[in-house]
């Protein structure tokens, strides 16, 4: 994926340098374990990103259905603004869980996973599937990040014979998808993923956005190359051997 570097472009706003970046979290067929893992990140921590505590990096404004202090229409308003191009700041989309085929649920007048409502043709307000949010927000997102095994590869909800026809973010967006920066979906696998892997990836994207660093390198599976070049077992051996060397 390093070959896509030539198509990169930094997002600039008429108002001047980037001071904030919005992060829209969407939850599909998930257990919220990836959210818990993200909150446990330490280097950098979610708190550091939200408070712009890392020198040079813009403030991250997180919109999360579980962690947000707002609710209802007030919470969902920013999602609608991003969809309509009225946000006034760049944004990234983080998707947790596999993406269900909502056309199946629609046949029975329901949905698999939804957040917020919108007015339908008959004047009633109907739930908005998170798959639709992903479809609507992905085109103008600076990056789309698939968080966890379900989002990256499909996970348990996508097992053979499942009734939801669930799939990964990559499969849902299609092989030709590129973000507004020219990036294909970024994959942070793991059940649950290491929280630091997610926050460090976000920080690297922010550094590139503001011109403080190069385009992060991703491997052939869309994973941050510097984080996933070693296997979990090899990393475990490294951690186990360190105390022995210190003694």
Language-model features, listed with the residues they occupy:
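FMN-binding flavodoxin-like domain, especially the glycine-rich phosphate-binding loop
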Residues: 134-236
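Extended, subdomain-level signal for the structured scaffold at the beginning of enzyme domains
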Residues: 4-134
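A residue-level signal for beta-strand positions that form part of recognition/binding surfaces
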Residues: 20, 185, 243
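Conserved small/polar residues in nucleotide/adenosyl-binding loops
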Residues: 238-246
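Short, glycine/serine-rich, charged loops/turns that create anion-binding
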Residues: 30, 151, 247
